Amino acid sequence: MITMKVKNFIYLPFCLFIGTSVAGALPEIPEPFKYGVGGIENGKIYIGLGSLGNNWYMIDTNQSEKKWTKIAQWPTVPREQATATIIDGKIYVFGGIGKDTSGVITLQKDVYSYDIAKDKWEKLMTRPPVSLAGHVSFIHNGHAVSTGGVNENIFNGYFSDVELSKGNSALTEKVNRDYFSKPADDYFLNNHIISYDPSKNQWKNLGTTPFPGTAGSSVIFAEQQIYILGGERKPGLRSVRSWTGELSHDRIKWSELPPVASPEGVSGAYASVIDGNIFLAGGAYFPGAAEKYSNGEYWSHKGLDKAYSKEIYQLIKNDWKKVGSLPEGLAYGVSLPWQGGMLILGGEKKDGKAVSDVIYLKKNDKQIKIVK
């Protein structure tokens, strides 16, 4: 076993330990990983897309020797900001953004499944009824449920205009000004809730959320309860709002939780259940953007540097409490439940570079243990 010096930090009401090796820790990802997708089934973890391009990896955590192995490559346009769910032995990938054959970034509307037993990808004869990129997805009763994400026409239109304006700085400035200088409502982010039934290859309308759509939110689904946390209200402006919904017979009863990560909010944060408790960690934001927006400066992140949060929050008695910190600020990786804790796979750090780290958060009594 590798042993490293352990640093100790105190954050009432918990102790936080940051170490580098305990029994059960997982090896680093073979490549730096961000903006991708992941899932876990029967102790096997699958990750792909994002900075991995067409590569996908699997690690079997049931084995004594835990190592990442390549599986079948993604067969089509590489993409970011997609989602993946695992249902009945298949991984279903929805949406995302990638470059089309002309080299322009566009929203992807195809749906693919990966047969775990056959190590094979298949394009499905279906398309989501609403645009899905920067959305969230979770599994309920064998269906993949999705909400949130960018507006296809507005998003695709912006990147098409950026491509057309190349070489003309004045036109590029106008394209950016026209795109960013709008209030949040005018981005028409998706607040429809849709459900995909893979056994019938059909979509179902579950209505809309009672709050505006977001992009880059974090989602948890546990014991018929949905948690949608933070996210982006518009490009460069985060949300502090968090919501919970009780799902029963395809109906959702929503209620708002106290704000999290105030005053700026975060997007691309990591979230999961740890020992029956709701946790949110990391995420990215632009310090000062919320104040500028409230003063009517709709291009609220212009001239601001992106920051990466280290904070770990726990939902305690219907309120968010800071209970610790990650080793460094991280966002835009994958978080998964594992062995009663939360795995943080990859992410982006302050310099914008992707990382290969695998971090494990575990709560023991009144202690949060972080293993990197």
Swiss-Prot record:
Span of the signal peptide: 1-25
Ranges annotated as spanning the membrane: none
Catalytic activity: N-acetyl-alpha-neuraminate = N-acetyl-beta-neuraminate
Pfam families for the chain: NANM (PF24996)
Subcellular location(s) per record: Periplasm
Record-listed E.C. numbers: 5.1.3.24
Keyword line: Carbohydrate metabolism, Isomerase, Kelch repeat, Periplasm, Repeat, Signal
InterPro entries to which the protein is assigned, alphabetical: Kelch-typ_b-propeller, NANM, NanM_proteobact
Job description of the protein: Converts alpha-N-acetylneuranimic acid (Neu5Ac) to the beta-anomer, accelerating the equilibrium between the alpha- and beta-anomers. Probably facilitates sialidase-negative bacteria to compete successfully for limited amounts of extracellular Neu5Ac, which is likely taken up in the beta-anomer. In addition, the rapid removal of sialic acid from solution might be advantageous to the bacterium to damp down host responses.
Family: Belongs to the NanM family.
Designated name of the protein: N-acetylneuraminate epimerase 1
Lineage: Bacteria, Pseudomonadati, Pseudomonadota, Gammaproteobacteria, Enterobacterales
Gene transcribed to yield this protein: nanM1
